[in-house]
């Protein structure tokens, strides 16, 4: 696709990421600008295009159109932002369960196409106008066994696991924790440690299989399964979520 959007820098700023800057095009779409410099940024952007081409159309993947100026993507509400703005208690359990199932469905599809997302989390899932969730941000993902250029958040990565299906599943467990509680795992450490120390401490805890308590959570068994290596595929995760 080579059409160009009606767009100017005067449009609303949405976000700035590692690779690109995102602006609103209209009420339904955003544009993720093509990076103009930086080898890493260019490589990650090219991988994102390849990922969207590989994934094609799927109801759990935000639709993408490639233009000269950037990627035109569906505009939704960031799941993390929604949890923080309305509060997790304001979202009914039935809706959280639906989103968990849909996210598992989306990640299963991503894996079936030979793609490892490599940054699974509530920050990379949007809620659309119909209250369904979709995955976004494949900049730097891994395709067909290639090493990803990106990695997970500090609260979603276990050292030594390697980047692949199992690491995506581990991060999915942290995503479920945040979906239910409104906070990332070990969020209470964020205010007392700088980022370098925070990463080191949490990675050490995860390496020793010391995870936040989940016994009182509805997703407890699935979260624990993701963190403890119970699952070999996200389809198994989806199956157990469906039993809740």
Regions found by a protein language model. Give the residues of each.
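Conserved structural core of kinase catalytic domains
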Residues: 56-99
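Conserved hydrophobic "DFG−1" position in protein kinase catalytic cores
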Residues: 24, 33, 73-75, 127
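Hydrophobic core positions within the conserved protein kinase catalytic domain
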Residues: 52, 104-107, 223
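Conserved hydrophobic alpha-helix
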Residues: 103-110, 176
């Amino acid at each position: 696709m080579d059409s160009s959007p009606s767009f100017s820098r005067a449009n609303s700023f949405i976000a700035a990421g590692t690779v690109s800057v995102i602006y609103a095009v209209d009420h339904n779409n955003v544009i993720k600008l093509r990076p103009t410099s930086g080898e890493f940024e260019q490589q990650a952007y090219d991988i994102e295009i390849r990922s969207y081409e590989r994934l094609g159309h799927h109801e759990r993947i935000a639709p993408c159109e490639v233009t000269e100026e950037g990627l035109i993507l569906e505009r939704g509400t960031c799941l993390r932002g929604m949890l923080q703005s309305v509060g997790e208690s304001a979202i009914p359990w039935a809706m959280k369960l639906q989103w968990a199932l849909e996210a598992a469905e989306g990640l299963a599809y991503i894996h079936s196409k030979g793609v490892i997302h490599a940054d699974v989390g509530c920050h990379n899932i949007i809620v659309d106008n119909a209250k369904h969730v979709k995955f976004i941000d494949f900049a730097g993902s891994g395709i067909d066994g290639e090493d990803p250029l990106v990695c997970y958040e500090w609260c979603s990565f276990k050292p030594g696991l390697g980047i692949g299906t199992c690491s995506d599943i581990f991060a999915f467990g942290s995503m479920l924790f945040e979906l239910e509680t409104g906070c990332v795992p070990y969020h209470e450490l964020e205010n007392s440690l700088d980022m370098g120390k925070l990463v080191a401490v949490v990675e050490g805890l995860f390496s020793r299989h010391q995870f936040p308590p989940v016994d009182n959570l509805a997703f407890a068994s699935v979260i624990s399964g993701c963190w403890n290596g119970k699952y070999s595929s996200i389809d198994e995760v989806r199956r157990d979520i469906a039993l809740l």
